[in-house]
Amino acid sequence: MRIYVLGAGSIGSLFGALLARAGNDVTLIGRREQVDAINKNGLHVFGAEEFTVKPKATIYAPEEPPDLLILAVKSYSTKTALECARQCIGRNTWVLSIQNGLGNEELALKYTPNVMGGVTTNGAMLVEWGKVLWAGKGITVIGRYPTGRDDFVDEVASVFNEAGIDTSVTENAIGWKWAKAIVNSVINGLGTVLEVKNGHLKDDPHLEGISVDIAREGCMVAQQLGIEFEIHPLELLWDTIERTRENYNSTLQDIWRGRETEVDYIHGKIVEYARSVGMEAPRNELLWVLVKAKERINRGKTRNISEGC
């Protein structure tokens, strides 16, 4: 399968490496530093598994349409990334978002009706250019967005599973996206404020109550919007924490790199949707404010993330 991965960060690089190792025609589209490192030395994955591959890598999307375009950029870059890649989105190209947050699939639907929503609980960390820590094997769920089924989705799931990405298919992609956003509201919120690995949120009994309260708040908002879940977000939360207990969440990684975070598309979206149905989401709003404050304080500063691995 010809696959383009738009966004060669932690998850994009991990998925691209696994798919390339399995023999797929993979092109990673990313930042110049990452592209140069991959083209020079290959892409090295270590942690849960260790291997090196050398997929194609470029800073610009090729003009030839792929079978599958995987969206792995940060949510705040989705609109710009899709616009830059629009020339390669052919009539038969499918777009799959494996991003955190809410609203990315809606943007993709403006370019093509062939959109899949995806969630993954794999833990990954780009410790340096061309080098990805696979901090924990998780599950991946994909489906036609917002709901429904298509044979190509099943084909993608088969390709992913053959590549070692544990993948299942859903007919309720929007429900899974909301469940994952609620999981991220806990892990990325508390984990970033406390600056701890995911596992700490489960190991510290004093954090269980607030974790449940944050998740329930998101569930109440989703319920008012008519969102149905195939898996309860709390079940997904504890499973994700256990699978990725040695990982630092992506929001904290961004803070340590002095970069913008995706908190507007996680907590911010939950608060936005809550207000749209006449509700408040005070816990999510508090975490939103606190993470944004850390983002401003650390903007432009960098920390050697490999020190925490």
Curated annotation (Swiss-Prot):
Q: In which pathway does it act?
A: Cofactor biosynthesis; coenzyme A biosynthesis
- UniProt cross-references to SUPFAM superfamilies, sorted A to Z: 6-phosphogluconate dehydrogenase C-terminal domain-like, NAD(P)-binding Rossmann-fold domains
Reported impact of W129A = Decreases efficiency of the inhibition by CoA
**Which residues does CoA bind?**
A8, G9, S10, R31, K74, C84, R257
Name the positions where NADP(+) binds: G7, A8, G9, S10, I11, G12, R31, K74, N100, A124, E262
Q: What is its EC number?
A: 1.1.1.169
Q: How does activity depend on pH?
A: Optimum pH is 6.4.
Q: Which reaction does it catalyse?
A: (R)-pantoate + NAD(+) = 2-dehydropantoate + NADH + H(+); (R)-pantoate + NADP(+) = 2-dehydropantoate + NADPH + H(+)
Outcome of altering Y60A?
Answer: Decreases efficiency of the inhibition by CoA
Description of how activity is regulated: Regulated by feedback inhibition by coenzyme A (CoA). CoA acts by competing with NAD(P)H. A disulfide bond is formed between CoA and Cys-84, which indicates an irreversible inhibition upon binding of CoA.
Describe the outcome of a gene knockout: Disruption of the gene results in a strain with growth defects that are complemented by addition of pantoate.
Where is this protein found?
Answer: Cytoplasm
Keywords from UniProt, A to Z, are: Coenzyme A biosynthesis, Cytoplasm, NAD, NADP, Nucleotide-binding, Oxidoreductase
- The active-site annotation reads K180
Q: Under the GO molecular function aspect, what terms does this record hold?
A: 2-dehydropantoate 2-reductase activity; nucleotide binding
In its keyword annotation, does this UniProt entry include Cell cycle?
Answer: no
Thermal effects: Optimum temperature is 90 degrees Celsius. Is extremely thermostable.
- Identify the GO cellular component terms for this protein: cytoplasm
Which enzyme class, named as a word? oxidoreductase
Quaternary organization: Homodimer.
Q: What does this protein do?
A: Catalyzes the NAD(P)H-dependent reduction of ketopantoate into pantoic acid. Prefers NADH rather than NADPH as the electron donor.
Name the PANTHER family on file. 2-DEHYDROPANTOATE 2-REDUCTASE (PTHR43765:SF2), 2-DEHYDROPANTOATE 2-REDUCTASE-RELATED (PTHR43765)
Q: What is known of its domains?
A: Cooperative binding of CoA and ketopantoate induces a closed inhibited state by interacting with the N-terminal and C-terminal domains, and seems to facilitate the disulfide bond formation.
According to UniProt, the name of this protein is: 2-dehydropantoate 2-reductase
Organism of provenance: Thermococcus kodakarensis (strain ATCC BAA-918 / JCM 12380 / KOD1) (Pyrococcus kodakaraensis (strain KOD1))
